[in-house]
């Protein structure tokens, strides 16, 4: 099989977005905010800015390096989408007998879940990064510019209400992700 020595992937930059590349550190600025990400763990990968295009490339193209180039390009695309449109996850509060109360503590960056399965103590889920969490009725809406922080926060809330020692087909109480995508 022929060996490929150069693999590059290009990411187009929209007009209302500014991208700065400093070695393997990429900063993306847009209407919704700023995201900085360090890709210094990626050995043998180079990132450069040319006109309105970010080029991610490698010159030693084995299977892992090819995958790494694609992964970094996808991360940069997600960063651009985040600063232009943002990301939103929606979670549903589901209970059958004990009414669950959810409140957001902005100061301590946590979500407090009260009366889950009739428990006396609160369950606590962490809010990651600069993510906005809003509770409206039986829905929890999580919005932010970094897809990883939004996803981590949603997973933290879902994991905090996991039912362990009961049959999940019967005890369906909890908070579950039902929609995720771009916030428009």
UniProtKB/Swiss-Prot annotation:
Which domain of life does this protein belong to? Answer: Archaea
Q: Does the keyword Ribonucleoprotein apply?
A: yes
Record's Pfam families?
Ribosomal_L6 (PF00347)
Q: Which InterPro entries match?
A: Ribosomal_uL6-like (IPR000702), Ribosomal_uL6-like_a/b-dom_sf (IPR036789), Ribosomal_uL6_a/b-dom (IPR020040), Ribosomal_uL6_arc (IPR019907)
An example Gene Ontology molecular-function term: structural constituent of ribosome
Does the record's keyword annotation contain Cell membrane? no
The similarity comment for this entry is:
Belongs to the universal ribosomal protein uL6 family.
Assembly notes: Part of the 50S ribosomal subunit.
Q: What does this protein do?
A: This protein binds to the 23S rRNA, and is important in its secondary structure. It is located near the subunit interface in the base of the L7/L12 stalk, and near the tRNA binding site of the peptidyltransferase center.
> What name does this protein carry?
Large ribosomal subunit protein uL6
Organism (species): Desulfurococcus amylolyticus (strain DSM 18924 / JCM 16383 / VKM B-2413 / 1221n) (Desulfurococcus kamchatkensis)
Q: Which gene encodes it?
A: rpl6
